[in-house]
């Protein structure tokens, strides 16, 4: 699928598709504001301006702040990768390496939050937690704040976040 999108870039077709999307979005916003009729919100086409493209999040959010100096990273994410626990064993360390390289500050601290407890019928969450744990063991200057005990079996987002924040703070302060 991505190859066909990449081919559209080369042919100039993507710009035409994106222009149609922008016009449709303007029409959607106008009709929504006027509440004249319900129409479905247009979907942004996959392509070079879509943040969901490969490395899109990095290019649209991280590259704009990477020139600034920082003391370390705090990363709290992973739910969208739960079905790829085995891949995450390589992807997560690679992401850490890439972020550190983008900032050019060596092996600055990279702290992250383990996925919390969440009741699911698959083993995926456990596999991803294991990949996170292995990363904390094998990637230099990383720390994992355990969140399993803070999770809510019925809600993907723990209600009480101060314990996880405290754990991250203790690691950041070297305690």
List the predicted regions and their residue ranges.
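Cell-envelope and extracellular/periplasmic
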Residues: 1-175
């Amino acid at each position: 699928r991505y190859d066909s999108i990449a081919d559209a870039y080369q042919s100039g077709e993507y710009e035409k598709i994106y222009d149609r999307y922008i016009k449709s979005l303007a029409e959607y916003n106008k009709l929504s504001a006027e509440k004249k009729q319900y129409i479905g919100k247009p979907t942004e086409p996959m392509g070079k301006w879509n943040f969901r493209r490969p490395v899109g999040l990095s290019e649209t959010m991280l590259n704009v702040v990477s020139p600034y100096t920082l003391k370390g990273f705090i990363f709290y994410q992973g739910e969208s990768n739960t079905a790829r626990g085995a891949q995450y064993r390589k992807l997560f360390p690679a992401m850490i390496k890439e972020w550190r390289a983008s900032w050019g500050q060596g092996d600055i601290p990279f702290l992250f939050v383990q996925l919390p407890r969440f009741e699911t019928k698959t083993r995926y969450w456990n596999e991803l937690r294991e990949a996170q744990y292995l990363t904390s063991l094998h990637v230099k200057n990383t720390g994992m704040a355990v969140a399993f005990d803070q999770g809510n079996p019925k809600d993907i987002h723990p209600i009480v976040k101060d314990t996880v924040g405290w754990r991250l703070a203790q690691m950041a302060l070297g305690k």
